[in-house]
């Protein structure tokens, strides 16, 4: 029933809310604080005369005062000092909004604060106004068609105050004020100034104001449910102006208060309840007034001031606001977040799927103090108790949602409802753990809450939990975290519980020890034992929660009072200390020389495995494995009921199951674990059933095959598996490094965090074997070949570390093994080198292969050539000879200092600098000739004619192409064969074997039978007519052609290898003149192309041999033999004084034509050492002369 300004009573179908502002400090920085001047009779006059049926129905087109002509005589409200502002509620369709102060409003976009339609029946209106007088004004928010409303601050500028227009606009219900054309004013204004609107909205969304400590101390948001009842004063206080526009001025919802919207499913609104006596005592207070509590809601805003202040899971504000408890419940976390439309709309969507639907609500009481439930006034203590619920569901829940009906507003959370003297004080867990939380009156707070749970700066109590029934949930989920987080910070350690299972404990445990599993903060309920937990399991399995409780139940009192730290070393030390106190060690730790019984170890380890397996598969645990929770301190210092130390568990079970072994099992050495040796005849198997697999209890027979220092490459799953299958398996033992490491891997188990069963099988056995290694000097077991084992580790992908051996005996053995290792490596590398050479000769080994790169990396870095490039050119031009005959018979070729004919001193037959394919061709072609010798191949490469220089520069095929004439037709049968006809000329490239040639015909290359062709003698060039040779004074000797020489001019003489030449005279130091006997061919030819075999006495003084230089640096090699008695023979021994002997360490392949080939262990006589690190010398093996890297040789 609503009453308009005229006093006429009329029925409404739409819901109406009457909001009465009280004396309040404004919490939003954007709203101006109201002063005393704002409460003028004008505002009161306008407030109570602006009610008409049209505005009551949402028709905010014009007011009744305007219709009666009162607009011209309205009071002047342009008080610039402190204009009064308020919040109004506007429907989702931008319906009529009213203001008690301002006649004009700025534009407001309906989409800016639009709310989901699913939350349409709950309206939460926070109000904060600074009013110093006792006068109050009413606001009325109307929702015509069930759409949502949002709080909009009103603002009045000076420009709008000066602008007064009276416009008669058509009436459109529900669209708000319109202009003369019928267009809503908000839409029109938004369209006219889109840029300003967007800029304003962007600033409002992204700006967070710092709270003002002086003005935001006493602002309490409260909640109204507009769909529950009709306000007795539902008339609209202030009519809407025709040119009203809407403009939100708050930076965020949290600045102006909290707008939290929740689903409302109550079908029937409760009847109206008369005001309570305490509310009627005040002249201005009514039953819809907010409670007389001053709560600083700004304290719950956890908006970080800077991104650098953000810490996940923490709130910098709440750190200063929670002086007593360091644990944040889910309610506190939800209150820390600013609410928004999106978070409110998505709160129910983000509810866990496993939670059942919310059950029918209990009528304990309504949420806010604006009203009470139907039967609440009749309950004992209801007049002095009001209910308040807080929202805490998911991280997306709104920040501060107070007020509203419990059936609508109470979220899925576990909270406690305890009415003093009320029969409905039992715990209730309906639906998704939803309960009502009653906040006692101020007079009873000190009695009810004795544990310091009150807020320092708040009078309202904020306490509940997400999944707990009675006590706050600890954040840590492992033993280590409990020790780190809880020491000195929790008021009573014995009341802490681990997880949901321990909180939702069964009936038996509650009856046996109610103080452990119930909250000490609710002594009324716990002392009377009247409440019983009724939990509806999220999982439909009946025994799920019971199993979950058994898996995670931990006695925290013993855990806190214990000195054991969650590390392997600490547990071992604690176990030893406990055993020493009980007198069970018998000099075990004191006497390290005592032998530990061998038969004790497998049994003891089996017991360990049994406990560890049970810890890993906790669902299989029985009731007998659960220790009763006791509050008494542990006796005998062992804490047998602690279930924290594996050693204590083992001690319990061994005393029960193995009384005879209980004494001996303590003899196991508890020193640091290392290696273990268990043979096949002592394979221990546990006497009890394994939960995972029986084979985990078997020790591997190959536990001693690998003796490698442990490394950290094993994953947790591998560690979890191999730690049980092998006591010293390479994977299992690799995870635990040494005993001084206080960190260890987590087990893969059903428990989160570190499980108490973190002491594994192999650590126990390795601990025992460490004692045996220290006490008994066993003979060294014969290992496999150390060289092979070293190679195996080198090529293996498994990382390893060599042990540091300190004993002299082992050092001697290591020294002995070093030679075999080096020998094995050297042999392997030699095989690799040979393989590379063979592959490179076949042309099948790319330069980027791994073997090639390996060899190149192992070889020394070749120094860059600089001064050695000119080392062979610095000698005088007239230093032609350096005879080096070996044994006086076979004379050595020397370099010739001919700059135009640089030799290719490549005597390396395996690798050619240009192409390995061509190097093979050279040898094949030379095999066709009858003059092949051991040096024929190298001689071919060191051919020093002009044509050789040309051919060496890129056309080596010209040298090896030998013409042949086809004597038969040959038709290719395969793609590799070469077809030709009789009479064709075929150029032979190389000889494949005794029956096949490879040749070229008409640009095609292929193979053909040797018998099908006949080699042709290359035609000699036609030499022009020349004058007859002069009369020879006489022959100076005889020589044999070493290489083929093709004449380029008509004065030169072409030579074939092996031709006998009569030397006529010495033209200069580089050229001879001679003739071939039996022919009329005569001409000059290079000295280096022939080998003098006979020298006559007369005629040889024309160009005498120069003396041997001290530092020979000639770049050409000559052959010179002399049988003159007066000339000494330069044998190999004669030149040793001229060079310093060096031995080659590595093979070196020449890269330039003046470089010398080196093979490993070659002896080289070094004549000169260049500044760039290159040496100049002669190889004693090949008798060639050239440069080579100095770091490839060592001094003999």
UniProtKB/Swiss-Prot annotation:
GO terms for biological process: acetylcholine receptor signaling pathway; cell growth involved in cardiac muscle cell development; Notch signaling pathway; regulation of skeletal muscle acetylcholine-gated channel clustering. Keywords: Amidation, Cell junction, Cell membrane, Cell projection, Cytoplasm, Membrane, Phosphoprotein, Repeat, SH3 domain, Ubl conjugation. Expressed in brain; found in synapses in cerebellum. InterPro entries: Endophilin_SH3RF, SH3-like_dom_sf, SH3_domain, SoHo_dom, Znf_C2H2_type. Residues 166-227 form the SoHo domain. It comes from the Eukaryota. One of its GO terms (molecular function) is protein domain specific binding. Pfam families: SH3_1 (PF00018), SH3_9 (PF14604), Sorb (PF02208). Ubiquitinated by CBL. Residues 25-57, 75-95, 235-314, 329-407, 929-958 are annotated as: Disordered. Residues 382-399 have a biased composition (Low complexity). The modification Phosphoserine is found at residues 27-28, 40, 130, 143, 254, 334, 340, 343, 354, 382, 392-394, 396-397, 399, 478, 589, 592, 645, 648, 844, 938, 1113, 1119. It is found in: Cytoplasm, Perinuclear region; Apical cell membrane; Cell junction, Focal adhesion; Cell projection, Lamellipodium. Residues 83-92, 235-247, 329-343 have a biased composition (Polar residues). SUPFAM superfamilies: SH3-domain (SSF50044). Residues 959-1018, 1034-1095, 1137-1196 form the SH3 domain. GO terms for cellular component: apical plasma membrane; dendrite; focal adhesion; lamellipodium; neuronal cell body; perinuclear region of cytoplasm; plasma membrane; synapse. The first 2 SH3 domains are required for WASF1-binding. All 3 SH3 domains can bind independently to PTPN12. Interacts with ABL1/c-Abl, ABL2/v-Abl/Arg, ACTN, CBL and PALLD. Interacts with ABL, CBL, DNM1, DNM2, FLOT1, AFDN, PTK2B/PYK2, SAPAP, SPTAN1, SYNJ1, SYNJ2, VCL/vinculin and WASF. Interacts with PTPN12 and WASF1 via its SH3 domains; this interaction may mediate the partial PTPN12 and WASF1 translocation to focal adhesion sites. Adapter protein that plays a role in the assembling of signaling complexes, being a link between ABL kinases and actin cytoskeleton. Can form complex with ABL1 and CBL, thus promoting ubiquitination and degradation of ABL1. May play a role in the regulation of pancreatic cell adhesion, possibly by acting on WASF1 phosphorylation, enhancing phosphorylation by ABL1, as well as dephosphorylation by PTPN12. Isoform 2 increases water and sodium absorption in the intestine and gall-bladder. This is Sorbin and SH3 domain-containing protein 2. It comes from Rattus norvegicus (Rat). The gene is Sorbs2.
């Amino acid at each position: 029933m609503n009453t308009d300004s005229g006093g006429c009573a009329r029925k409404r179908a739409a819901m109406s809310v009457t909001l009465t502002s009280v004396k309040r400090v404004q919490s939003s920085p954007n709203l101006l604080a109201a002063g005393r001047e704002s409460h003028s009779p004008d505002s009161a006059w306008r407030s109570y005369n602006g009610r008409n049926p049209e505005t009551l129905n949402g028709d905010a087109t014009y007011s009744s005062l305007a219709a009666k002509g009162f607009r011209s005589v309205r009071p002047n409200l342009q008080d610039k000092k402190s204009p009064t502002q308020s919040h109004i509620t506007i429907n989702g369709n931008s319906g009529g909004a009213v203001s008690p102060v301002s006649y004009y409003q700025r534009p407001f976009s309906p989409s800016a604060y639009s709310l989901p339609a699913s939350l349409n029946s709950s309206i939460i209106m926070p109000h904060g106004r600074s009013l110093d007088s006792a006068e109050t004004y009413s606001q009325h928010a109307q929702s015509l068609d069930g759409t949502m409303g949002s709080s909009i601050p009103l603002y009045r500028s000076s420009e709008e105050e000066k602008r007064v227009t009276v416009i008669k606009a058509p009436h459109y219900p529900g669209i708000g004020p319109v202009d003369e054309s019928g267009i809503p004013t908000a839409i029109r204004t938004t369209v006219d100034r889109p840029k300003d609107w967007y800029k304003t909205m962007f600033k409002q969304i992204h700006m967070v104001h710092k709270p003002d400590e002086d003005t935001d101390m006493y602002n309490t948001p409260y909640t109204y449910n507009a769909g529950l009842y009709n306000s007795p004063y539902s008339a609209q206080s202030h009519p809407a102006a025709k040119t009203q526009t809407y403009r939100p001025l708050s930076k965020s919802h949290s600045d102006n208060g909290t707008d939290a919207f929740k689903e409302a499913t109550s079908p029937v609104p409760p009847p109206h309840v008369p005001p309570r006596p305490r509310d009627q005592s005040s002249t201005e207070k009514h039953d819809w007034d907010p409670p007389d509590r001053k709560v600083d809601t700004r304290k719950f805003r956890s908006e970080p001031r800077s991104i650098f202040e953000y810490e996940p899971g923490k709130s910098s504000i709440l750190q200063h606001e929670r002086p007593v408890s360091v644990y944040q419940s889910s309610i506190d976390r939800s209150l820390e977040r600013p609410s928004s439309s999106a978070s409110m709309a998505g709160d129910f969507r983000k509810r866990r799927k496993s939670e059942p639907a919310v059950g029918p609500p209990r009528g304990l009481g309504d949420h806010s103090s604006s009203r009470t439930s139907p039967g609440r006034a009749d309950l004992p203590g209801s007049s002095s108790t009001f209910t308040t619920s807080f929202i805490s569901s998911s991280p997306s829940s709104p920040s501060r949602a107070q007020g509203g009906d419990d059936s609508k507003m109470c979220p899925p959370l576990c909270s406690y409802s305890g009415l003093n003297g009320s029969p409905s004080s039992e715990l209730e867990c309906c639906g998704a753990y939803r309960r009502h939380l009653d906040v006692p009156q101020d007079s009873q707070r000190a009695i009810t809450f004795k544990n310091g749970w009150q807020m320092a700066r708040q009078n309202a109590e904020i306490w509940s939990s997400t999944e707990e029934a009675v006590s706050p949930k600890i954040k840590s989920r492992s033993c280590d975290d409990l020790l780190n987080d809880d020491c000195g910070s929790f008021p009573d350690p014995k009341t802490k519980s681990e997880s949901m299972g321990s909180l939702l404990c069964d009936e038996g445990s509650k009856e046996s020890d109610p103080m452990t599993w119930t909250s000490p903060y609710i002594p009324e309920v716990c002392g009377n034992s009247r409440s019983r937990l009724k939990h509806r399991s999220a999982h439909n399995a009946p025994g799920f929660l019971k199993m979950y409780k058994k898996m995670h139940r931990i006695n925290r009192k013993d855990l806190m009072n214990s000195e054991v730290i969650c590390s392997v070393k600490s547990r071992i030390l604690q176990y030893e200390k406990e055993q020493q106190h009980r007198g069970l060690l018998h000099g075990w730790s004191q006497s390290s020389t005592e032998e530990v019984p061998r038969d004790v170890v497998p049994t003891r380890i089996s017991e360990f495995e049994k406990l560890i397996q049970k810890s890993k598969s906790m669902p299989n645990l029985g009731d007998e494995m659960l220790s009763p929770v006791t509050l008494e301190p542990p006796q005998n210092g062992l804490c047998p009921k602690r279930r924290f130390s594996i050693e204590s568990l083992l001690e319990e079970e061994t005393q029960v199951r193995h009384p005879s072994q209980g004494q001996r099992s303590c003899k196991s050495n508890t020193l640091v674990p290392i290696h273990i040796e268990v043979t096949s005849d002592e394979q221990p198997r546990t006497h009890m059933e394994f939960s995972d697999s029986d084979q985990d209890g078997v020790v591997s027979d190959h536990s001693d095959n690998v003796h490698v220092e442990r490394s950290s490459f094993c994953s947790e799953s591998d560690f979890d598996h191999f730690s049980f299958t092998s006591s010293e398996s390479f994977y299992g033992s690799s995870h635990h490094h040494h005993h001084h490491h206080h960190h260890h891997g987590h087990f893969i188990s059903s428990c989160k965090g570190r499980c108490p069963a973190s002491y594994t099988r192999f650590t126990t056995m390795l601990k025992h074997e460490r004692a045996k290694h220290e006490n008994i000097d066993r003979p060294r077991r014969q290992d496999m070949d150390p060289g092979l084992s070293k190679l195996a580790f080198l090529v293996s992908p498994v990382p390893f570390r060599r042990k540091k051996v300190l004993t002299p005996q082992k050092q001697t053995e290591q020294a002995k093994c070093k030679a075999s290792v080096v020998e094995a490596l050297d042999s392997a590398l030699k095989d690799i080198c040979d393989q590379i050479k063979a592959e490179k000769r076949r042309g099948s080994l790319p330069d980027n292969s791994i073997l090639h790169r390996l060899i190149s990396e192992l070889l020394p870095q070749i120094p860059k050539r600089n001064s050695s490039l000119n080392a062979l050119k610095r000698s005088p031009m007239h230093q032609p000879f350096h005879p080096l005959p070996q044994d006086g018979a076979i004379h050595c070729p020397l370099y010739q200092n001919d700059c135009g004919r640089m030799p290719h001193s490549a005597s390396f037959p395996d690798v050619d600098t240009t192409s390995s394919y061509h190097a093979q061709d050279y040898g094949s072609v030379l095999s066709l000739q009858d003059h092949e010798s051991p040096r024929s191949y190298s001689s071919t490469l060191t051919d020093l004619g002009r044509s050789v220089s040309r051919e060496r520069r890129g056309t080596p095929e010209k040298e090896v192409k030998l013409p042949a004439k086809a004597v038969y037709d040959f038709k290719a049968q395969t793609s590799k064969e070469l077809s030709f006809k009789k009479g064709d000329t075929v150029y032979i490239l190389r000889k494949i074997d005794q029956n096949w040639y490879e040749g070229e015909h008409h640009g095609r290359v292929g193979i053909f039978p040797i018998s099908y062709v006949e080699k042709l003698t290359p035609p000699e060039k036609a030499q022009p007519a020349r004058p007859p040779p002069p009369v020879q004074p006489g022959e100076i000797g005889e020589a044999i052609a070493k290489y083929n020489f093709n004449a380029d001019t008509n004065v030169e003489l072409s030579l074939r290898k092996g031709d006998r030449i009569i030397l006529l005279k010495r033209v200069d130091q580089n050229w001879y003149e001679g003739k071939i006997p039996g022919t009329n061919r005569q001409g000059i030819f290079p000295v280096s192309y022939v080998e003098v075999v006979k020298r006559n006495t007369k005629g040889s003084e024309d160009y005498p041999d120069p003396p041997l230089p001290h530092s020979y640096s000639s770049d050409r090699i000559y052959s010179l033999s002399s049988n003159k008695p007066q000339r000494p023979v330069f044998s190999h021994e004669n030149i040793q004084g001229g060079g310093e002997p060096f031995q080659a360490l590595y093979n070196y392949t020449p890269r330039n034509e003046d470089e010398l080939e080196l093979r490993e262990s070659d002896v080289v006589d070094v004549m000169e050492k260049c500044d760039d690190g290159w040496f100049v010398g002669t190889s004693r093996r090949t008798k060639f002369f050239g440069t080579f890297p100095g770091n490839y040789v060592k001094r003999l």
